From Swiss-Prot:
Disordered: annotated segments: 1-23
GO MF annotation list: protein histidine kinase binding
Lineage, highest ranks first: Eukaryota, Viridiplantae, Streptophyta, Embryophyta, Tracheophyta
Membrane topology label: Multi-pass membrane protein
Location in or out of the cell: Cell membrane
Glycan-carrying positions: N67
Protein family per UniProt: Belongs to the Casparian strip membrane proteins (CASP) family.
NCBIfam families linked to this entry: A_tha_TIGR01569
Entry keyword set: Cell membrane, Glycoprotein, Membrane, Transmembrane, Transmembrane helix
Name listed for the protein in its UniProt record: CASP-like protein 1E1
Amino acid sequence: MEHESKNKVDGMEMEKGKKESGSRKGLELTMRVLALVLTMVAATVLGVAKQTKVVPIKLIPTLPPLNVSTTAKASYLSAFVYNISANAIACGYTAISIVIVMISKGKRSKSLLMAVLIGDLMMVALLFSSTGAAGAIGLMGRHGNKHVMWKKVCGVFGKFCNQAAVSVAITLIASVVFMLLVVLDALKLP
């Protein structure tokens, strides 16, 4: 009798362990899909951000201003190109890691767990650094810099600046999702 109840308890514990493992895997898969969507959206929003405006330039105070058509594009600023590239790399990595998680079906070796953990950690570093770079340039565009005589450009290119700000915010959220994935990965290590 005692042996049977022990088996039942062990059986219940085993089923409970499977449920926790399945729900943890489901959480991981959901977070990876979320990271995939966030990085794809962030790269796309900033990649297509473009605005053209006619800007009056006054060359000589006595003459009327000269109207010049000016375009703001993400490809004109290296920090924005870096942000787009970082999001594209993270998106590609996430697609690969989703396939690995789905194929492994809970049978991941320690070396595979470590590889995914290191990959996730690299994405955290990459995305946080690109967020910082793009955010710094975005703030410079929004507020200018009086010390070096850089003028605000977001007053002219408001739509472009807003798209850049949205992309940077989405990248920051994706960075946090990857950071949470690192924590989940670390909890799986034996």
